[in-house]
Amino acid sequence: MRGATRVSIMLLLVTVSDCAVITGACERDVQCGAGTCCAISLWLRGLRMCTPLGREGEECHPGSHKVPFFRKRKHHTCPCLPNLLCSRFPDGRYRCSMDLKNINF
């Protein structure tokens, strides 16, 4: 009976509260795991979240290429994965692509 009362109170608190728990929130890259960086959220202004490094075809920013970056990032995208390059495409956008200079033909 006590357990049921506790669960009821917890559910009541969850439904009444005006907050959310955000996992993956960060301030700097060193707080994120391998293969991620601390980028600005597109949805919540002022929030930074651990975000995966850019894969081939994903948007990137040419000035954002260091991981870890020891200050606060100013972009919503992470640098590309180590084997990729942030390249400008004909449509004017920057995307992660293969570094053709390092391929042996």
UniProtKB/Swiss-Prot annotation:
Its main location: secreted. Pfam families: Prokineticin. Keywords: Angiogenesis, Disulfide bond, Growth factor, Mitogen, Secreted, Signal. Residues 1-19 form the signal peptide. Disulfide bonds join C26-C38, C32-C50, C37-C78, C60-C86, C80-C96. The keyword Disulfide bond applies. GO terms for molecular function: growth factor activity. GO terms for cellular component: extracellular region. Potently contracts gastrointestinal (GI) smooth muscle. Induces proliferation, migration and fenestration (the formation of membrane discontinuities) in capillary endothelial cells derived from endocrine glands. Has little or no effect on a variety of other endothelial and non-endothelial cell types. Induces proliferation and differentiation, but not migration, of enteric neural crest cells. Directly influences neuroblastoma progression by promoting the proliferation and migration of neuroblastoma cells. Positively regulates PTGS2 expression and prostaglandin synthesis. Belongs to the AVIT (prokineticin) family. PANTHER family: PROKINETICIN (PTHR18821), PROKINETICIN-1 (PTHR18821:SF7). This is Prokineticin-1. The gene is PROK1.
